[in-house]
Amino acid sequence: MINSAVNLLVNPQDYYIKSESREDLPQINLFKLVGNLGYHAMMLEVHLTPKPGLVDLCTNGAHDDMDIHTFENSAQAINPFLIKFLYAGLNHSDTPIDSLLPKLRPVGLNAEEAMFQATSGINTHKGMIFSLGIVCGVIGWLRGNNLSFDAMHISKAVKCCCHDLVFKELRQNHDKPKTYGEFLYKEHGLTGARGEAASGLATVMDHGLPAFEKTVKEGFSTEQALWQSLLVLMANNLDTNLVSRGGMEGLLYAQQAAQGLLVKGGCRYTNLESELTELDEIFTEKKLSPGGSADLLAITWLLAQMNELSPKYV
């Protein structure tokens, strides 16, 4: 069940600003709207219920240190920074896209600080800040260059922006890994969120987004489309969150469990909710949390909105 307070049908006119500022009002309106949609993406992900091993409206999943309120507080703290990512991209749109990432990092660090302050030190959305920050920054850059900001253009721009991220942050420290992400790369070749960004959000573009848009086009609800997309993402994503908690065996188990529900019909399966609830109990017992796929689910929904929004502004 998705919280009804999360309004999916955002009207751009709701963000009209009356101002004597010389700034481009349509630009301000657009960035406020995109930032708002980024916030909605975070809220939709956490409110989707049930989910296996993840915090939702009914359970804390495999997490002992956080609940739905922790996530809501975190999302609210991050929200103001999304428009800052957008303007960081816009303000550096006269520079090559492959030089954008360092300009986004300060905003990301400030967003992380706000998140930790809101959650008393609990990491709820660090991966989400990374992914949403890059996507929003790229949208700002594309807008500054009068380019479309649909999913395809965002994907290509993210790939150019982050093309050497794996080399700079994972391969260079291959022999002496300093972080757990570097260790997972050395031991298993897993690149996590960095690899997803460097690939141009390939898992989202190849799996999550097509599943979401196809399901919506077939007449299913947003909630059902989100379930379908989450299962497709879980079945295909090399989720380092799962590996950190359950090793490669945990990742394989989660992938097979998601694939099993897809074989039964996914969102078309009449017992999906009850089986997701049962799977949540199993994941919780095994301490498995597909947090990487949860982040990609939010990105999937946001890119679907950009496909609808971009033609109205370009």
From Swiss-Prot:
The keyword Hydrolase does not apply. Disulfide bonds: none annotated. It comes from the Bacteria. It is an enzyme of class 2 (transferase). Its EC number is 2.4.2.52. Keywords: ATP-binding, Nucleotide-binding, Transferase. GO terms for biological process: prosthetic group biosynthetic process. It holds the Pfam family CitG. One of its GO terms (molecular function) is triphosphoribosyl-dephospho-CoA synthase activity. It catalyses: 3'-dephospho-CoA + ATP = 2'-(5''-triphospho-alpha-D-ribosyl)-3'-dephospho-CoA + adenine. Belongs to the CitG/MdcB family. This is Probable 2-(5''-triphosphoribosyl)-3'-dephosphocoenzyme-A synthase. It comes from Photobacterium profundum (strain SS9). The gene is citG.
